[in-house]
């Protein structure tokens, strides 16, 4: 699965079977806050959300930002 980062839109996205899934974030005060994780039900249950959150998390660490989450899915993912 190819994940694309669109920094001008503050999101990571992927297209699977013609459906777009994405994570949105904001950067403020040295923190990257994962705000929303959206995966259409047609492509749910395939681990897509986890891969998108991981890509966002990895980006935060690479850029010396503290990853935090407002998104309930990402909160649980970050606790693992």
Identify the residue ranges that each predicted region occupies.
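Glycine-rich phosphate/pyrophosphate-binding loop shared by adenosine-nucleotide-utilizing enzymes
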Residues: 19-22, 32
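Conserved beta-hairpin
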Residues: 10-20
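A conserved beta-turn-beta hairpin within the catalytic core of GNAT-like acetyltransferases
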Residues: 26-35, 66-68
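A short, internal acetyl-CoA/4′-phosphopantetheine-binding micro-motif in the GNAT/acyltransferase core
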Residues: 37-44
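Conserved GNAT acetyl-CoA-binding A-motif
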Residues: 58-72
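Structural motif
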Residues: 6-8, 28
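Conserved N-terminal entry element of GNAT/NAT acetyltransferase domains
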Residues: 1-5
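Conserved acetyl-CoA-binding loop-helix of GNAT-fold acetyltransferases
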Residues: 45-58
């Amino acid at each position: 699965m190819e994940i694309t980062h669109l920094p001008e839109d503050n999101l990571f996205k992927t297209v699977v079977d013609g459906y777009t899934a994405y994570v949105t974030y904001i950067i403020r005060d040295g923190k990257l806050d994962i705000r929303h994780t959206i995966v259409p039900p047609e492509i749910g249950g395939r681990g897509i959300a986890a891969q998108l959150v991981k890509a966002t998390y990895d980006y935060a660490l690479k850029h010396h930002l503290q990853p935090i989450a407002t998104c309930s899915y990402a909160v649980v993912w970050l606790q693992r």
